[in-house]
């Protein structure tokens, strides 16, 4: 923890080592890797480190069930290598100015690549080679030579990513199959070169009215399409953890969106700010977890001090989706439901009960004396 490790073969090396925490280190100019995990190293957490100029920023070799979160990795040949390793979580890292961003290869399986910023790598943003069953969700993959490269890989699922300005290839596919959307109304990915419109809604996009989903599929190659491309960039806001479940609210919008605030103590509502060029039209498509905030008789939506009555409400098993439009300026949007998740998580409530029980016992014991 909090070490500065420069110019070794490996900055930190774990072999058959589990349950370690690697946090807050600076790992620079190491010949092979900043962090190397091998031979069954598992259940390790690598978080909050800064890595620059290592050949591999972080490398997994035959190692599974590890978490890599909130690291900054740049100046490497490969930012994160997952070699014959499975069930790892790669979450909220910034991986930029490497040759390749994230590489999963040699029969790696079921790794989750989520909410990372994968930017300005001179090769591939994400490379999946001879590896299967990955979930690539909620990432910003932009300004790379190729955003995503798939080579002889199957059953990978890719949605809710912002795939932007990767040139010459947004995606490069060789003998691979994957799913490019999460169905309707959840949707697929935002593509910066999508040329379609949003005048229709519904699973078949054949009912008049906008829904934040492009009216026509995004064609990736002759065999692959994103059937429900998002019509603007998606922003994913973490709003808290209750009963061990992390909740997020997702907003697809052509506005700049900032400062989402959700506090159950304030009631069944949340608010966020939007900005855009005056005189233009803005829209939001907001995905709200059903177990976080819900209604009994309609949502109350205000933009500034103006109520929104003409909104579209859709739902699937887990989320409610609200789509509405407004005139651009600096605005605060408030969305109010009827009921909200309990203010105190179950774990916290149980702990409070135990503390109160203990204090009561102590108080009774003192009274006897």
Task: Show where each model-derived region lies.
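Consensus "Asn ladder" position of solenoid repeat domains
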Residues: 2-3, 20, 25, 30, ...
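Glycine-rich beta-solenoid repeat tracts in large extracellular/virion proteins
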Residues: 10-16, 33-40, 56-62, 78-84, ...
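Acidic, glycine- and Ser/Thr-rich low-complexity intrinsically disordered tracts
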Residues: 109, 137, 154-245, 318, ...
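Surface-exposed beta-strand/loop patches in extracellular or lumenal glycoproteins
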Residues: 172, 275-296
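C-terminal beta-strand-rich structural cap/linker in extracellular carbohydrate-active enzymes
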Residues: 230-233, 315-340
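Carbohydrate-binding surface patches
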Residues: 252-285
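Short, threonine-centered small-residue motifs that mark membrane-proximal processing/anchoring sites
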Residues: 339-349
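C-terminal membrane-anchoring or membrane-association module
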Residues: 359-369
């Amino acid at each position: 923890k909090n070490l500065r490790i420069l110019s070794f073969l490996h900055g930190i090396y774990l072999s058959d080592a589990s349950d370690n925490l690697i946090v807050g280190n600076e790992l620079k100019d190491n010949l092979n890797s900043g962090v190397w995990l091998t031979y069954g190293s598992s259940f390790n957490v690598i978080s909050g480190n800064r890595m620059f100029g290592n050949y591999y920023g972080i490398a997994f070799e035959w190692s599974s069930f590890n978490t890599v979160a909130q690291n900054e990795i740049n100046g490497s040949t490969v930012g994160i290598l997952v070699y014959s390793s499975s069930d790892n979580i790669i979450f909220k890292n910034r991986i930029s100015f490497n040759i390749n961003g994230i590489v999963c290869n040699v029969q790696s399986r079921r790794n989750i690549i989520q909410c990372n910023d994968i930017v300005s790598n001179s090769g591939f943003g994400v490379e999946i080679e001879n590896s299967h069953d990955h979930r690539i969700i909620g990432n910003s993959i932009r300004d790379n030579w190729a955003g995503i490269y798939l080579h002889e890989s199957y059953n990978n699922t890719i949605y809710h990513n912002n795939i932007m300005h990767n040139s010459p290839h947004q995606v490069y596919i060789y003998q691979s199959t994957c799913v490019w959307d999460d169905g309707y109304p959840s949707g697929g990915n935002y593509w910066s070169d999508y040329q379609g419109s949003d005048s229709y809604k519904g699973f078949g996009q054949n009912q008049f009215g906008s829904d934040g989903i492009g009216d026509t599929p995004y064609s990736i190659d002759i065999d692959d399409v994103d059937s429900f491309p998002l019509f603007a960039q998606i922003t994913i806001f973490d709003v808290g953890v209750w009963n061990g479940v992390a909740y997020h609210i997702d907003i697809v919008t052509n506005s700049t969106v900032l400062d989402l605030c959700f506090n159950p103590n304030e009631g069944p509502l949340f608010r966020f700010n939007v900005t855009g060029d005056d005189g233009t039209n803005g829209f939001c498509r907001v995905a709200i977890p059903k177990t976080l905030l819900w209604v009994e008789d309609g949502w109350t939506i205000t933009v500034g001090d103006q109520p929104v009555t003409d909104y579209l409400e859709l739902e699937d098993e887990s989320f409610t989706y609200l789509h509405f439009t407004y005139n651009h300026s600096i605005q605060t949007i408030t969305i109010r439901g009827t009921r909200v998740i309990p203010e105190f998580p179950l774990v916290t409530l149980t702990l409070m009960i135990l503390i109160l029980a203990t204090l009561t016992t102590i108080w009774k014991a003192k009274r006897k004396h």
